[in-house]
Amino acid sequence: MVGVNGERGRRWRVVVLALAAVYFLLPLFAAAEFSLRAPGGGHGLANWVAIARDPVLIGALLTSLQIAVITAVLVLVLVVPTAVWVRLRLPGLAGVMESVTILPIVIPPVVMAAGIAFVQANLGGPVFRALFASSTTALTPFYVVLALPFAYRAVDNGLAAIPLRTLVEAARNLGASTATALLRVVLPAIRSAVLGAAFLTLALVLGEIVIARILLYTDTFPVAIVEVGRSTAGVAVALSLASLLITWALLLAVSFAGNRRSRSGGSG
């Protein structure tokens, strides 16, 4: 009886996995097929070639990647020391930090974008003019705010999985400063969590469109996809697939880096 139940359970798992694969992969195959349709009929790489030959699209992709990298660095600089400090010195504020960092999820991006647009239109001065002079300087601070909920929880979960206080106290007893303990002891121990937070930030920036669209910054990759889709749907679908492939490549890079670190730590 146990063997029959086990066999039945395995069959159900196979069925569920097959249905999940169809659910996720079928739309991707359909999108890939649509992106390969030629304007005159048949199939070809015309839509993908159009992306490679369009300097506006390439520039938008590079701009979004630049914003994503800067945002990820700023988020980690803010989140990692804060999360470590809260766990070590102010554990009573853990609930407050959870509530504060979740606010960007609670507040709709449209509301945030409307407030930013009001500031952009009504507040002058050299600081605000310099801030809104380009999409990189204008969007990066707000993307940092949007990424805080995801990055903070990823880093905080990583800290919860290690004996943080023991590691820091051991490093301090050996003569290391707080900064040295953070950089050379804590950070390597939570490298997978830090890489996960960076990946979530990159994925968010590469997909965010509301704030950029309302603030009229059209030189970002998500906005470029929408603009192209108005005239050439095939190119827009190819752009969406390219964005997905870039995100997957980043995820694989993060996973590879984390696994390599784990193997090297285990062998050492």
Show where each model-derived region lies.
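Membrane-water interface segments at the C-terminal ends of transmembrane alpha-helices
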Residues: R8-G40, R53-A160, V185, A189, ...
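The alpha-helix within a helix-turn-helix
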Residues: A171
